From Swiss-Prot:
It holds the Pfam family MurB_C. This is UDP-N-acetylenolpyruvoylglucosamine reductase. InterPro entries: FAD-bd_PCMH, FAD-bd_PCMH-like_sf, FAD-bd_PCMH_sub1, FAD-bd_PCMH_sub2, MurB, MurB_C, MurB_C_sf, Oxid_FAD_bind_N. Belongs to the MurB family. Residues 197-211 have a biased composition (Basic and acidic residues). It comes from Cereibacter sphaeroides (strain ATCC 17029 / ATH 2.4.9).
């Protein structure tokens, strides 16, 4: 029995069309809260034994074909506000990273590193996303969140355990808002810089394909703060290339010809195709280099039940 809500609560919702890779089976339930109070009430009344999975826009996610045995919480319009207060940029967790970068730039505040990061602010914080030498950890002041028990809390950045492509947020904790400190900049110059970033990204990454961004973490060369070590040249895409896996395929899944660390749905892929190809890449890169790549894309859910 699910608690009453003011938002939308749907049983058995197929998640494929909510992920960038367009794969995935059904969630037991999908909850889209109306606002933070609705989320607090729902989690506070939900049976503690029921798993909860916060989901953003699905830009860095493979949901397995058997679906997800959990309540998936997906924030929407009630959580996408962006406001500027002095040197602080406060963004709802559902606000897109690119929108936050643009709004900040229009106000003369520099969060340009967010412009080409796919996804929403909640996911960016959870993964300590970064680009062009800047990471969320470099700018984040604090977040608002709702715990699995249904308590609204404010957490300083220092308590989030932000490191390279990861954080230590408690399981089931749903981020609702993030506050960043942003340096001043000329709006025209910030806009020009973002245009350059977009051009650079579009010339080197398969932005017109169905992908989930970088597939594997760069294997080394990052400090515990998540800041890049500029003296280290080891990159996942180089290891994949050296193993002869650029363009490798399994079913409808492919390692991009344009950028070999991008796993794409080339047409009709299942989650099993995508995850299976990724695991094959890990195996063959290890055989080639002795280095074991780690997934950057999150994989969740169950394998499909064999009905034969």
């Amino acid at each position: 029995m699910m608690p009453p809500v003011r938002g939308t609560l749907t049983q058995g919702r197929i998640l494929a069309d909510l992920t960038w890779l367009r794969v995935g089976g059904p969630a037991d339930w999908l909850f889209q809260p109306a606002d933070e109070a609705d989320l607090v009430q729902f989690l506070g009344a939900l049976d503690p034994a029921v798993p909860v999975f916060p989901m953003g826009v699905g830009s860095n996610l493979i949901v397995r074909d058997g679906g997800l045995r959990a309540v998936v919480i997906r924030l929407g319009r009630g959580f996408n506000a962006i406001r500027i207060e002095g040197d602080r940029v406060i963004a709802g967790a559902a606000a897109l990273d690119a929108h936050v970068a643009r709004r900040a730039a229009e106000a003369g505040r520099d969060l340009t590193f967010l412009r080409t990061i796919p996804g929403s602010i909640g996911g960016a914080v959870r993964m300590n996303a970064g680009c062009y030498g800047s990471y969320v950890a470099d700018h984040l002041i604090e977040v608002r969140a709702v715990t699995r028990e249904g308590r609204a809390v404010t957490l300083p950045a220092a308590e989030l355990g932000l490191a390279y492509r990861q954080s230590a947020l408690p399981e089931g904790c749903v981020l609702t808002e993030a506050t960043f400190r942003a340096e001043a900049g000329d709006p025209a110059e910030l806009a020009r810089r973002m245009d350059e970033q977009i051009a650079r990204r579009d010339s080197s990454q398969p932005t017109k394909e169905r992908s989930a961004g970088s597939t594997f973490r760069n294997p080394a060369g990052f400090s515990s703060t998540g800041r890049a070590d500029d003296t280290h040249e080891l990159k996942a895409w180089k290891l994949i290339d050296e193993a002869g896996l650029r363009g490798a395929r399994r079913g409808g899944a492919q390692m991009s010809e344009m950028h070999s660390n991008f796993l794409i749905n080339a047409g009709g892929a299942t989650a099993a195709d995508l995850e299976g190809l990724g695991e094959e890449v890990i195996k063959r890169v290890f055989q080639s280099s002795g280095i074991r790549l780690e997934w950057e894309i999150m994989r969740v859910g169950e394998l499909p039940v064999n009905k034969e």
